[in-house]
Each structure stands twice: as structure tokens, then as C-alpha cells.
Regions:
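Juxtamembrane helix-loop transition sites at the ends of transmembrane segments
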Residues: 43-46, 66, 95
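Compositionally biased, intrinsically disordered low-complexity regions enriched in proline and serine
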Residues: 18-20, 33, 63-64, 71-74, ...
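Basic, Lys/Arg-enriched alpha-helical interface segments
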Residues: 2-61
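Enriched for short, Lys/Arg-rich terminal
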Residues: 70, 74-103
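Basic/aromatic recognition patch in beta-strand/loop cores that engages polyanionic ligands
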Residues: 49-80
Length: 103
């Protein structure tokens, strides 16, 4: 099992890093991104609590909260875990999630 960061999630990680770096410095940005990846690694072992994505999103998958962000993921057809997107708690999540779904 591998963790696959999908394109939209990769773009969100870049945005999170830049925002955090610009606001609180590179050390904090590095720590936050490292912590996010550590959380990704805990998905398979259930070291973090994930919840099913609500039916109104129209996609099978799960999400968990990490600090001020929600991480959305799903099991890929080969069994790997796909990180679909990462959204800030203030974002209108339903619209952003639909925008970030792979086409």
C-alpha cells in the first residue's frame, strides 16, 4: 500500500506551504507539511480517525481533520490510498471538493 498524492492535493499542499511560510516562517511551514504527511501515513493503520465523506459529495471516500485543514482521501483501484484534496476549514468544502475531484 502506498500513499498517492493526487494533483489537486499536491497543488493544495503547495498553497498551504507558501501561506504558512509567508505568515509564520519556513520552519513552521516545514513542520506543518511534515505533520500532514505523517498523518497520511497513519491512514492505513487507523492511527487517525477518518469519517466517510457525506453522501451529498457524490463520491466514495473518507476525510479527517488535521489542525485547520480537512484531508479527503479514497482507496484507489489498486489498493493504494489517494489523497484527493486538502481544504482549509473556512473553505466552502462541497464546492471546492467537487472542483478538485480527478476528471
Amino acid at each position: 500500500m502506498a500513499i498517492r498524492v493526487q494533483e489537486a492535493a499536491s497543488l493544495r499542499l503547495d498553497e498551504i506551504y507558501r501561506y504558512t511560510r509567508d505568515r509564520w516562517g519556513a520552519e513552521q511551514a516545514d513542520r506543518y507539511i511534515t505533520d500532514l504527511f505523517a498523518a497520511f501515513d497513519q491512514i492505513e493503520s487507523h492511527g487517525i480517525t477518518s469519517r466517510p465523506i457525506p453522501a451529498e459529495f457524490g463520491v466514495d471516500g473518507f476525510y479527517f481533520r488535521h489542525a485547520h485543514h480537512f484531508v479527503y482521501w479514497r482507496r484507489l483501484s489498486n489498493g493504494d490510498i489517494g489523497i484527493v484534496t486538502i481544504l482549509h476549514e473556512r473553505m466552502h468544502q462541497m464546492d471546492r471538493f467537487r472542483e478538485d475531484l480527478p476528471k
